[in-house]
């Protein structure tokens, strides 16, 4: 392995010539973006193609759907195609489908009912393509199956119903668990694991040879319940008593669900419970499961302690059921992100390895780790970060990935050889651009997606030749022509330097008819959460922010600033906010606003800030500083006190209340002077059916402000009946954005020398100072 380590110093291969000239969305016409074109979603936007690649004898094959609904097997290189499922065999109103690996059958999901962000209930049917027969996965199903997945090699399907695990094989079904119920989840995550750990709806994993199934069991017994009332409940006439949804929702320092690791032998139905001893049961989070073999020899899980600042990778030998910690890490200088990036690659110079991403060096990079434990091998290094692994090609010994090597706001696609350690760009990595790629099943081809800042496009390449595209997949020529009719906002990117030395990325939008000799109102639009990124070179969506920049009656300048704590600028920059969320972030937004005001065109009397979710929290914390810089603010679906938010997200960054009581008290929005002293107004928007950031946050915040003396001319609270975190129920999003537009219009019209005054206030002043107050 010395060979690999020495070659780490090998040079990076020469960058290729870009395949086409850039096509900046400069407009050039006279039309201005309108409200209806931008809100609630951008109607003028780039198109993109996403392919369902198929692993078959021919590389480059994928499934598409014809205009009449038939499913077609196509080869993207040869343009040959074959109808696999005729239109009359496609179930009406289906939600999704998955082909059996040998393409002999299709699993359909129908009768979709949404549950949480990723999960849903459905009926499932199996279509035998040769026979044309459609068979229900469960004869008595009633739209109640939670998840189903084909085995990678045979006729088996694992599915979850009623929180119990079942195995279907050629028409025969075996129930493998009997304890599923309201508090026990087999093979699917509960709410908090779905939302904060896996970001998906399953917790089961077939071995590569299909002989074993690893799955997790979650026990919510004792986890506190949160009740969400639904006042209309999607009915024309509201029920006399609201429907109440009870969710086991662990808040900070409350009891978390416990988790167990299980192995199931598919053929024998023998189940084994694997003791998880990496951390005590009440101090354990399992973040990832991955098979570390080409068959079923070993499987591993990533374990964290409760506050997710210590990590252990535990390998399990399937035959002996023996567990071994093969890697561990202390991340108590901040937190450890769950990147879900482990992938087995097999033999390298006589030793088995898997690949993973770690920021232990201070920057997120790719490493090879021995399956049985031992010294890791760094494949990438430097003061930049690997964002995602796109593909592992074990035959060519190449790992394809995206990174921020050029700049933290950019993404370029590279390959790195774990045989020679040579890193090669697949794109021109000397330009400010944002790329990603989708690789065919065998890795012979890829669709390169250029996503900004110019007009996006997609091209097909062979991995044998990254210099010349085989064809254009999506040109977006029509979008380019459409944009030529418009005079668009002027978008630019730059950095500002903090007194402490760090730099903050800024995205600025100027009105299309910007005149540096005029005064312009400004709206800051942060998100600002840990590890997030808003300022990037990706396509500038022509959304609400572009609308308020373009409307002649508004003409706002917008600034989006990625504060400390946000992503892709290294671990130190991220971890600075640990244990005190909202403190440095608010300081950075205030600093940026003061830098903005060095521009003569910035109207100091009309500087606003609007954010959603964490951005709504950050808006409130920024106004709380009472800096005098911001004159109005809008918080949409904000957290107001992280003691009211879920444990697995919050404790990752704040630890528990017992460990950080003062930090939680300071993080809560509790100081009212900044709101009382606003020259303008503060608006809170929240959905009453929000199962993520509960409406409780807005209720507590508005009560804090009202009881603290914030007057009615400074504060408005708007709720949206039964809407979730996205505020999409009924016509809520339409009303919401109209309210936002009215808010920024009213704030622009506000005159500091003569603020709007209600007749009651006029009468009070008249009584105190005489009739002159009425003038």
From Swiss-Prot:
Family matches, as SUPFAM superfamilies: alpha/beta-Hydrolases, DPP6 N-terminal domain-like
Glycosylation sites: 81, 111, 170, 219
Catalytic activity: Release of an N-terminal dipeptide, Xaa-Yaa-|-Zaa-, from a polypeptide, preferentially when Yaa is Pro, provided Zaa is neither Pro nor hydroxyproline
Gene3D superfamilies named among the record's database cross-references: alpha/beta hydrolase, Dipeptidylpeptidase IV, N-terminal domain
EC class: hydrolase
Leader sequence residues: 1-15
Pfam families referenced in this protein's UniProt entry, alphabetically: DPPIV_N (PF00930), Peptidase_S9 (PF00326)
One GO cellular component term: extracellular region
EC number of this enzyme: 3.4.14.5
Biological-process GO terms, alphabetical: proteolysis
Active site positions, chain numbering: 613 (charge relay system), 690 (charge relay system), 725 (charge relay system)
GO molecular function, one term: dipeptidyl-peptidase activity
Cellular localisation: Secreted
Keyword set, alphabetical order: Aminopeptidase, Glycoprotein, Hydrolase, Protease, Secreted, Serine protease, Signal, Virulence
Domain of life according to the entry: Eukaryota
Family: Belongs to the peptidase S9B family.
Function of the protein: Extracellular dipeptidyl-peptidase which removes N-terminal dipeptides sequentially from polypeptides having unsubstituted N-termini provided that the penultimate residue is proline. Contributes to pathogenicity.
Protein name: Dipeptidyl peptidase 4
Organism the protein comes from: Trichophyton equinum
Lineage: Eukaryota, Fungi, Dikarya, Ascomycota, Pezizomycotina
